[in-house]
Structures are given as C-alpha cells and as structure tokens.
Amino acid sequence: NPNGYFVDGPVLDMKFKSGIGMFPIPIAHGLTVGEFAQMVNGEGWLSNKVKCPVTIIPVANYTHDMPYTLPVKPSPNLNTQQSILLYPSTCLFEGTYLNHGRGTYFPFTIIGSPPLRGKYEFSFTPTGIKGMSETPLFMNQLCYGLDLRNYDVAELRKTKQINLQWMIELYKSSPNKEQFFDNKLSK
C-alpha cells in the first residue's frame, strides 16, 4: 500500500455501501492487502459471515513507513505514483461539481471547473478518453483550478493526514457554494 504510512479520513456508513465502498474503513486505511484480508475475515464482513482462505507471505524488513511504488497501476485513473499518493486527499472531489482530472491523462492531480475562471491561472480541458473517462464532467470545456502534479508528496508523509486545504481553498473560491457539493459527499 503506497499510502500505508497513515490512517485518516471518514469511515463509510454502511447504508451507503456500493461497489466503490464496501467496508467500514477510512479512505486512508494504512493496511497491506494481507492485513486487510485478515480484518475482513476477523470482522465477518463477507456475506453470510463467509471466511476467505488467506495466506500471508511476509515481506522481509517491511514497515508501514517504507515508501512503496505499485508495480501495476491500480486503476486507469490512478496512472501515476503522484495520483496514487494524492488520491486520499483528492478523491473527495468526486463529491463536488469540480472535475478532478478525469478526461485528462492526469486524474486526481488536477482539479477545476469553468466557473473558477479568473480565480486561477491553471487551466485544462477534459475530453473523452477511451478506457479512462469517456464522458467526463465539463467535457470539452475549459476548466480552471489547481495543478498538483508537482506537489511535494513528502509533505503528506510528514503530516500523515489527508490534505483538506485544497477542498477548503476551492470551496472558498467557488462562485457556486450552494452547488459545490453533490449528494455523493454526504454518503
């Protein structure tokens, strides 16, 4: 887990269980796959309290503070180490009216919307990208906002917490505060 060095974020309310969130864990859970499997078994979270067989293969000298780069991208929209490390902080933008980089080759590292014109210099135009995001929010519209591609993720490692400052900044800059959050964020 590249973000295995910290635990932070809201815990899923199980009445909002979906294919995206299936278990009551925080956004940044800090677990290895083996630890997560043991937790699922131990808490009886599988249907009918089924237990899955788990074999743990220890990694010599592993600690949760060790930097780790995934050998394979976990999702077409988590295609860089930067996006993976920023994801616990930027995934919350999926519950807003902002485009969070879908429809670009930089998902979860750039965030913006057309109404932020004049408030930010950085801009991007989401387009349909087969296999990534074919109908992104604000498709073919110029969006203005934040570019986090060069953000020093070592800062996240220092604080060991989700960065909410970007959400606060973009909310304050938004001319549409009453429409900023969609109903997904309350779930």
Please annotate each region the language model reported.
Residues N1, V59-N61, S113, Y151:
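Active-site-proximal beta-strand/loop segments in catalytic clefts of secreted hydrolases
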Residues P2-K15:
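Glycine-rich, charge-decorated loop segments at or immediately adjacent to ligand/cofactor-binding or catalytic sites
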Residues N3, E35-E43, T96-H100:
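Noncatalytic linker/hinge segments flanking ATPase motor cores
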Residues K17-T90:
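Conserved anion/nucleotide-ligand pocket segment
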Residues L31, E35, Y105, K119, ...:
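Conserved active-site and cofactor/substrate-binding residues in soluble primary-metabolism enzymes
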Residues K51-V54, Y105-P107, G145:
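Extracellular structured ligand-interaction cores
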Residues N61-L142:
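Glycine-rich, aromatic-lined ligand/substrate-binding cores of catalytic
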Residues G112-K187:
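Conserved functional hotspot residues or short segments at active or partner-binding sites
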